[in-house]
Amino acid sequence: MSDVIDELAAQWRACRHLLVLTGAGLSTESGIPDVRSATTGQVRQPGCADALSLRFFQQDPAAFWSAFRTLFPFGTTGSACPDIGHRLLAQLAATDKTVTVVTQNIDGLHQRAGSPHVIEAHGSVERLVCPACLCRDHDATCQVQPVPHCHCCGEVLKPDVVLHGEPVEAMDAALAALAEADCLWVMGSSLEAGPVNQLPALARHWRMPSALVNLQPTALDSRFDLCLHWPIGEVCAKFRQILGFDSD
């Protein structure tokens, strides 16, 4: 593993603007389960996609919110803390290089860790939005209501995340960030969810150095210059040692 991490460190030293696409595997050490896991992922269960769809939210808001809170309980507790992966990316961003994070996660942990440039591809479970008036000014008391309502217009609030049937509006920002970057890393993503899984192919087309850090192989491994199939926590700890970063 050390030789490959040395190559990862060489990519870091050579780049000026690193783009990092992160997935659920980056947050598992924070105690947040990978809902897309091949063995335990809830979103693979029959009917789950329908329960997390815009259509179901519109048809039965109460049932939708019950299902959503079962799948994503961390959204109402805020108890999860950034792990070594989140902290490493924030530490890299504090150097003289630019680090942009495009995250598929909805847990807000990159921001809590201190990363300044975060594009939330799928939104954030920590926010609520009114689909009628688009108001986002809702306090924490709304989060604990069985069916939260907008204090501006009274309509049922939606979690500010991308549901099945909704477009990934942040994709434009992700593409713009990739165009400005000169290195792409993917950390903790199976690269099954589109459209952000198109980024590795674009990076390959542009001959951009790239690396994948994910416990399991993906169908897109051939798109990367480096593939590290080890626990992210171990990779990040070794990477920090190589760069001489202090532990925290």
From Swiss-Prot:
Aminoacyl-tRNA synthetase as UniProt keyword: no
Name recorded for this polypeptide: NAD-dependent protein deacetylase
Compartments reported by the entry: Cytoplasm
Cofactor(s) needed for function: Zn(2+)
Active site: 122
Residue numbers binding nicotinamide: 106-107
Species in which this protein is naturally found: Laribacter hongkongensis (strain HLHK9)
Gene name per UniProt: cobB
Family to which this protein belongs: Belongs to the sirtuin family. Class U subfamily.
Chain positions recorded as Zn(2+) binding sites: 130, 133, 150, 153
UniProt keyword annotation of Transferase present: yes
Limits of the Deacetylase sirtuin-type domain: 1-246
Family matches, as InterPro entries: DHS-like_NAD/FAD-binding_dom, NAD-dep_sirtuin_deacylases, Sirtuin, Sirtuin_cat_small_dom_sf, Sirtuin_class_U, Ssirtuin_cat_dom
Function: NAD-dependent protein deacetylase which modulates the activities of several enzymes which are inactive in their acetylated form.
Cellular component per GO, a single term: cytoplasm
Top-level taxonomic group: Bacteria
Top-level enzyme category: transferase
Signal sequence, renumbered to the chain: none
Catalytic activity, EC: 2.3.1.286
